Curated annotation (Swiss-Prot):
Pfam family, one: S4
HAMAP family: Ribosomal_uS4_B
Designated name of the protein: Small ribosomal subunit protein uS4
S4 RNA-binding domain: residues covered: 98-161
UniProt-listed GO biological process terms: ribosomal small subunit biogenesis; translation
The keyword rRNA-binding belongs to this UniProt entry's keyword annotation: yes
InterPro entries hit by this protein: Ribosomal_uS4 (IPR022801), Ribosomal_uS4_bac-type (IPR005709), Ribosomal_uS4_CS (IPR018079), Ribosomal_uS4_N (IPR001912), S4_RNA-bd (IPR002942), S4_RNA-bd_sf (IPR036986)
Role of this protein: One of the primary rRNA binding proteins, it binds directly to 16S rRNA where it nucleates assembly of the body of the 30S subunit.
Family: Belongs to the universal ribosomal protein uS4 family.
Stretches assigned to coiled coil: none
GO annotations of cellular component type: small ribosomal subunit
Keyword entries, A-Z: Ribonucleoprotein, Ribosomal protein, RNA-binding, rRNA-binding
Subunit record text: Part of the 30S ribosomal subunit. Contacts protein S5. The interaction surface between S4 and S5 is involved in control of translational fidelity.
Organism: Sulfurovum sp. (strain NBC37-1)
Amino acid sequence: MARYRGPVERLERRLGVDLGLKGERRLAGKSALEKRPYAPGQHGQRRTKISEYGLQLQEKQKAKFMYGTSEKQFRALYKEANRKEGNTGSILIQLLEQRLDNVVYRMGFATTRASARQFVNHGHVLVDGKRVDIPSYRVKAGQKIEIREKSKTNSQILRAIELTNQTGMVEWVDVDKEKLFGIFSRVPEREEIAIPVEERLIVELYSK
């Protein structure tokens, strides 16, 4: 299954959560979800009871759409998380957080993960001094992520820096916003990752 490429604000309204897909509008308080916090369509404001399977599927969709992964990528990460010792759901979220496009987003070099993914694809990002153009590349603790020299005047990146200065950084990255580089200092604990996803339901879905 390919990545979702439809209207992202309709998707957020359908799932009922801010997925961080419209960065600038969200930061400006203009997101459609804030204005119309109900599902799109003629019957969007009606309350409907969702089945257990529906809830499980919804949580998987939230995580997939939020981090911008395909079904194949997401399932592979779940299988890897399931093989590791510890809480499978928490490990899954930690693996998603280690994606290069997500780390670029967390460092404030992009207003959305989709923009960060595009920057990586276009070769704007270096990892330990070497260009990496694979958004799913797994960043390890201690690695340096920077915007390459030729891209430091990119208007989208500079605009992202300006906007994300208002929101602050997460605890597990150290960023120099003047020199446009950051260190992924450690893998965050699950409780530090503020995303509206109940990964327990994802584990239940894949465990069937």
